[in-house]
Amino acid sequence: MSQSRYFFTSESVSEGHPDKVADQISDAVLDDFIRQDPNSRVACETFVTTGQVIVGGEVTTTGIVDVQKIARKVITEIGYTKGEYMFEANSCGVLSALHSQSADINRGVDRKEAIADEFDRVGAGDQGMMFGYACTETPELMPAAIQFAQQLVKVLADIRKAGKIMTYLRPDAKSQVTLEYVDEKVARVDAVVVSTQHDPEPAGMSEAEFQEVIKKDIIENVIKKVIPANLLDLNTKFHINPTGRFEIGGPHGDTGLTGRKIIVDTYGGAAPHGGGAFSGKDPSKVDRSAAYASRHVAKNIVAAGLAEKCTVQVSYAIGVARPVSIYINTHGTAMHGLSDEQIQEKAEKIFDLRPLAIIRRFSLDNPQGWCYQETAAYGHFGRDIFPWEKTEKVAELKTAFSLA
């Protein structure tokens, strides 16, 4: 029988990428509102460009947030602290254009009439469909390509911030990983792309010589630290700063906007996406909270050994608490003779997907040990610090199918 063989690619970007700068500012503003008023309704969008930050959106809250202070703090933490970057924390302009949320929307989300079940009193913040996914390719039950891509730019940022080696690094960077699959299993890494912003070449060194130094450093100190040696071979291609010099970057090189890296934020294209971004949105927005809950469902199903892959879709109508639809697909990998219909029937009873139930389950209105800003770079999934990554429902799922 002939083997099935194909290639699959995912990308990521660093915290210094302009779109991620915007995401982190939006989520830092959200964090401050939530800290002051857990019932805050926030939709915060950020625009960053050369020397300028604009923060706008709709808010219903009792909290008061210093947008300028928060934006400058985030930009400092990322590392844009030098005037030569043309986007610098203390000198950039910061304009706040936040205003009140529509009362029409708020009325549908927070219903005050007497409803017996508390979880039925909070409707979805909007219509839409959200997806969750999990698979057995990595210990985190994430697709391997996106997990490697996230780790590459995270390690690159850690090296830059430590300041001991590769001191020429600047904040903006991108990564991309191409995997070769044989019979649906990861066989090897076919190509790795890393582009990183950097200082000008040192005096006495040519551009070509400096790029060779950067290439060697990234292969040895980043790629080989992240990707298992057994997946790299003599035919693996490394494309490091393939266009050469990359001095101009960040918001000076490209304008950044909140919500433009939704595939980087999720599964790297290995699973569907409903289209709604996450950052800057409070947990009443199901674009965010239901995507987290869907990942939680999918991950627990895979962790319980019910399937090797699982996609979960959930959809909502604005102002209505209960999902309009729930769909589970294990892509033909269900175990123990189970069907997708059987898995879905039990999952719907075990996982309450009403917005307030999701908020309570993960303490999304009072984060403990994490904050929304942390989600805004290096992925919302596959990181154990977040409560939707817990697999505490495994035992209950196994019991439901008499597998315990």
Swiss-Prot record:
Disulphide bond pairs: none
Signal peptide bounds: none
Binding of K(+), residues: 45
GO CC annotations, alphabetized: cytoplasm
Predominant subcellular localization, coarse grouping: cytoplasm
Residue ranges the record marks as coiled coil: none
Free-text remark on how the cofactor is bound: Binds 2 divalent ions per subunit. Binds 1 potassium ion per subunit.
Transmembrane spans: none
UniProt entry tagged with the keyword Cytoplasm: yes
Region called Flexible loop, residue ranges: 101-111
GO molecular function terms noted in the UniProt entry: ATP binding; magnesium ion binding; methionine adenosyltransferase activity
Function text: Catalyzes the formation of S-adenosylmethionine (AdoMet) from methionine and ATP. The overall synthetic reaction is composed of two sequential steps, AdoMet formation and the subsequent tripolyphosphate hydrolysis which occurs prior to release of AdoMet from the enzyme.
NCBIfam families with a match to the protein in the record: metK
Family: Belongs to the AdoMet synthase family.
UniProt protein name: S-adenosylmethionine synthase
Naturally occurring in which organism (per UniProt): Chlorobium luteolum (strain DSM 273 / BCRC 81028 / 2530) (Pelodictyon luteolum)
Classification lineage: Bacteria, Pseudomonadati, Chlorobiota, Chlorobiia, Chlorobiales
Gene: metK
